[in-house]
Amino acid sequence: MLRSTFLRSAAIAAISALAFSAGARAEEGKELHVLWSGGQYGDAVEKCINQPFTAATGIKVITESPGGLAKLQAMNEAGNITSTVFDLPTDELKRGTAQGLLEPMDWKAIDPEPMYDEAKDKYGIGTSYFSTIMAYRADAKAPKNWVEFFDTKNFPGKRALPDYPGYTLVFAALGDGVPVDKLFPLDLDRAFKTLNRIKADTIWWQAGAQSAQLLKDNEAQYAIAWSGRVVGKEGIVTSFQDGMLDLSWFGVAKGASAAEKAAAWKWLHWHTNAKNQACVATYISYTGPSPDLDPLLPKDKLKEYPTYSENKKVQWLANAQWWLDNADVVEKRWQEFKLQQ
């Protein structure tokens, strides 16, 4: 008992010391703490933005993975905000906003260079576009649209689908003939009807790399996949037509110090620079929010990028607000559907 009491006291003291240390550094304005997913995208940002940003401003960017809303919620509940910037998918940006966990963006302080309006949110800045698209083996019969993609009679083969309702139900609705401009509010009955029809030919994937691997190994002949995993891969054909365009966001934690917020606004400005975005895109085929990006990208790879003008115009934007408003209903029906598989 005495030992556990001592350990708890020591832990609390350590957390307090860390909080004081982080606060002191933040007040000096010499460090910016970022929680993000990291990976290949993180490596690219480190080379193209973080290192030159530090060289120019003297502000060191300290990153930690993984990021996400759960980390921000935990810090908020503990009353100890030790990181300032968090990377968030669109749905988590909306949830974090609804829960009051994010600071409003100071767009005057960020002073962004030209960027798409959809990437400017009151509580977040969209810095990286990605697409969810149709992919299939080069030796498979080519579908022209989502109705044909889900037609296993005339286009035989296994379908590799994301084991996530937000990335599957929308395309299943399109597969039942729902027009793109009538997609929301989503008709769940039509979406599940499509999935039930092809359940014998469905393989579910949970990690993005699985979609490409299933196609490569010929375990699946068709897939719904994230563009960065399949575009440009040997033996795989892709189409951005009626794909879902989405953004990854950075948000700033409510309760962060004034000094770290000031550093965050400076750092986020660098993400709006087209040349910096083009540099990132040379490492991973996800693009930033600049409308001036196309001329800066490698001409031989233009068709691989989500925001290439010819790709962007044939896609539709994810509707995170609908998913937030209907999360409980969707999750209940999704779990019921999966239990029947």
Which residues are covered by each model-predicted region?
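A ligand-binding cleft/hinge motif common to bilobed small-molecule-binding domains
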Residues: D91-T97, K216-D217, Q221-I236
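Conserved C-terminal helix/tail region of periplasmic/extracytoplasmic solute-binding proteins
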Residues: K312-Q341
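Extracytoplasmic ligand-binding site segments that recognize negatively charged/polar headgroups
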Residues: S37-E46, I81-S83, D87-K216
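Periplasmic-binding protein-like
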Residues: M115, Y129-T132, D189-R197, E234-A256
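Short beta-strand->loop
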Residues: L102-I110, K122-G126, Y222, E234-M244, ...
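A bilobed periplasmic-binding-protein/Venus flytrap-type ligand-binding module shared by bacterial periplasmic
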Residues: S131-A140, A173-V178, L247-E260, C279-Y283
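Mature extracytoplasmic/periplasmic domains
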Residues: A253-A318
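Early extracytoplasmic/lumenal segment of secretory-pathway proteins
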Residues: E27-G96
